[in-house]
């Protein structure tokens, strides 16, 4: 993958995803994807109803676009999933948002695409829960290139 050909997608435009989108969108073509149509419409008007970012901060992302249409993910080759990972009353993570995001992006994956999960789940969740969904739906084979949570010091 060549840096000139990078097109980033940030899936989930909450308190983690939206600032990430803005920073990438200052330099690279970046698609902000969220299923909440009202959120997308307000962001297109440079209004963040959560008040995390100002209109000026949103406007600084000159290469950012917004969409709630999954087919727009087809043009992206770096996909960063930033959906919430709530916990149940026993403090166990609810993985449904990650699973649903994986099902949403999988049909649009191509060989050599990069998928990053920015999440607060237990170590191995991406590999154990999300990768099988991506592989089954996309027909591709996932490989874990880098796991910043693993201790590689000897």
Per-segment meaning from a language model:
Residues 1, 62-76:
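Short acidic low-complexity segments
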Residues 1-47:
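NAD(P)+-binding Rossmann beta1-loop-alpha1 motif at the extreme N-terminus of oxidoreductases
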Residues 25, 74, 109-110:
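Short conserved AdoMet
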Residues 79-80:
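N-terminal Rossmann-like NAD(P) cofactor-binding module of classical short-chain dehydrogenase/reductase
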Residues 83-84:
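Conserved NAD(P)H cofactor-binding loop of Rossmann-fold oxidoreductase domains
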Residues 87-154:
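Rossmann-like NAD(P)(H) cofactor-binding subdomain of soluble oxidoreductases
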Residues 47-66:
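N-terminal glycine-rich dinucleotide-binding loop that anchors FAD/FMN and/or NAD(P) in oxidoreductases
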Residues 29, 63-65, 147:
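Conserved beta-strand segments of alpha/beta enzyme cores
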